[in-house]
């Protein structure tokens, strides 16, 4: 399936869906997950068919009507509008952008933690609790093991990076010692 990537149009559609469904976000999210599950079970023909520019619009509408009993009316009508406007190839990106808006609305974040060994459940919970006030609810933690950081961890939340690794600390000490040596050499000259 050809997927449209990003852009103004996608975010406009995603924002429109968000605004239309702000009172029933859970129902819309369940519907989107239902559609994603159609795709993930080896049968991605639903979104592929809606994205196909050569498929007949009446056939696309018929296919959308097949799932209307499984998704919210607002979502099915939204999909009809998108497909009628020949934007079916954008649906996947629209849904992903919409889900980002929902996560921001609910103050939910996903974080990535790089550590020298696998984090325990207790360590993950401690990190979540520490980040709760600044970032909101942590929905998922991805733990990557990198022995080269020697100890501590590096947390990535969106564009923010919190580096409390031993390797980073040692590099800082090395830079400080170079500066100290230079200043000592310069002061003796």
UniProtKB/Swiss-Prot annotation:
Major localization listed first in the record, in broad terms: membrane
Provide a GO CC annotation, any one. Answer: plasma membrane
What terms describe the molecular function in GO for this protein? Answer: proton-transporting ATP synthase activity, rotational mechanism
Q: Does the keyword Membrane apply?
A: yes
Q: Name one Pfam family in it.
A: OSCP
Enumerate the subcellular locations listed in this protein's record, separating them with semicolons.
Cell inner membrane
Give the InterPro entries listed for this entry: ATP_synth_OSCP/delta_N_sf, ATPase_OSCP/d_CS, ATPase_OSCP/dsu
Q: Classify the protein's membrane topology as the record does.
A: Peripheral membrane protein
Xref: Gene3D superfamilies: N-terminal domain of the delta subunit of the F1F0-ATP synthase
Locate the transmembrane regions by residue number: none
Tell me the keywords, alphabetical order. Answer: ATP synthesis, Cell inner membrane, Cell membrane, CF(1), Hydrogen ion transport, Ion transport, Membrane, Transport
Q: What does this protein do?
A: F(1)F(0) ATP synthase produces ATP from ADP in the presence of a proton or sodium gradient. F-type ATPases consist of two structural domains, F(1) containing the extramembraneous catalytic core and F(0) containing the membrane proton channel, linked together by a central stalk and a peripheral stalk. During catalysis, ATP synthesis in the catalytic domain of F(1) is coupled via a rotary mechanism of the central stalk subunits to proton translocation. This protein is part of the stalk that links CF(0) to CF(1). It either transmits conformational changes from CF(0) to CF(1) or is implicated in proton conduction.
Self-association or partners: how does it assemble?
F-type ATPases have 2 components, F(1) - the catalytic core - and F(0) - the membrane proton channel. F(1) has five subunits: alpha(3), beta(3), gamma(1), delta(1), epsilon(1). F(0) has three main subunits: a(1), b(2) and c(10-14). The alpha and beta chains form an alternating ring which encloses part of the gamma chain. F(1) is attached to F(0) by a central stalk formed by the gamma and epsilon chains, while a peripheral stalk is formed by the delta and b chains.
Q: Which family does it belong to?
A: Belongs to the ATPase delta chain family.
Tell me the protein's name.
ATP synthase subunit delta
Species this protein is from: Ehrlichia ruminantium (strain Gardel)
List the top taxonomic levels of the source.
Bacteria, Pseudomonadati, Pseudomonadota, Alphaproteobacteria, Rickettsiales
């Amino acid at each position: 399936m050809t997927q449209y990537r990003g852009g103004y149009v996608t975010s406009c559609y995603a924002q429109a869906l968000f605004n239309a469904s702000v009172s029933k976000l859970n129902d819309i999210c369940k519907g989107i997950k239902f559609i994603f599950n159609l795709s993930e079970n080896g049968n991605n023909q639903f979104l592929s068919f809606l994205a196909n520019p050569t498929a007949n619009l009446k056939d696309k509408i018929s296919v959308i009507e097949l799932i209307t009993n499984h998704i919210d009316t607002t979502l099915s009508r939204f999909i009809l509008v998108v497909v009628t406007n020949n934007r079916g190839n954008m649906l996947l990106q629209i849904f992903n952008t919409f889900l980002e808006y929902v996560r921001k609305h609910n103050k939910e974040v996903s974080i990535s933690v790089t550590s020298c060994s696998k984090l325990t459940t207790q360590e993950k919970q401690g990190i979540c609790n520490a980040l709760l006030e600044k970032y909101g609810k942590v929905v998922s933690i991805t733990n990557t093991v990198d022995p080269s950081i020697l100890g501590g961890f590096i947390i990535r939340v969106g564009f923010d990076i919190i580096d409390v690794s031993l390797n980073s600390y040692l590099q800082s000490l090395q830079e400080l010692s170079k500066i100290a040596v230079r200043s000592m050499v310069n002061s003796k000259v």
